[in-house]
Amino acid sequence: MQVITSKDNELIKSIKKLKEKKYRDAYNKYIIEGIKIVGEAIQEKADIEYVVICEDCMNENIFDKKLMYEIAKLNCIYVTSKVFASITDVSNPQGILAVIKRAEKSQKINYKEDVIIVLDGIQDPGNLGTILRTVDSANLKQIVISNDTADAFNSKVVRSTMGAIFRINIIKSDDLIKDLINMKKNGFKIVVTALDTNDSVYDIDYMKKVIVIGNEANGVSQEVQEIADNKVKIPMLGKTESLNASVAAGIMIYEYVRLKLGGVSGDGAFWQPIFCQ
């Protein structure tokens, strides 16, 4: 087993480059790190270019035997703890990461889904990752993100998704208003959160809706608000006026899930339960 001992190794330097968005975009690759997400990548049949393993961590037997059996089938690179420390973004690394080639997924919006989630300027990687995880938990297969939303393949985003990133088609919109208008032409209505409304998130039927989640500081952009069909707010019992973007997204997505399972919406619409296969 050959072990890389130098941080100046060309392969190690190429991995370090993937910490920057411009190189992730140029090479169409990104990094995942940690035992669980590497296992998820294998399970989801992600295109793993190679796995990097810290020699010392392997000697400590912290890896599951079944995982090591699967990893052994891949292109594995072994490095010293010093070299691994130079490429990790985690304060307490588990000693394993992988370089993933981005899947060649369609950038066309699928209008067959009940609900489309759109992100309008989400900046925090943790929020973006949590929203992707929530979208996956609702069995939604796509998300549309504006140009000014954080990079979905940022390492913090990827960690926050807990593997959901392998199951969701992330569609980057170069012209969000144009894409939203096309969604309306395909029978969808646009729902945004706003403070200047008396309508609650619990008052509407979520079938064939586009749920737009806005920027953490400024909310949904004015241009998007102007073409919205429904403005809603999340009822607050305390003095707080707004919620974290990922929390707000979770509340709205799970109101859709509740209705999907046979609940009644505030407008009186009753949904027959439709269980996803």
Segments (PLM) and residue ranges:
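Post-transcriptional modification and biogenesis factors for structured RNAs
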Residues: 1-277
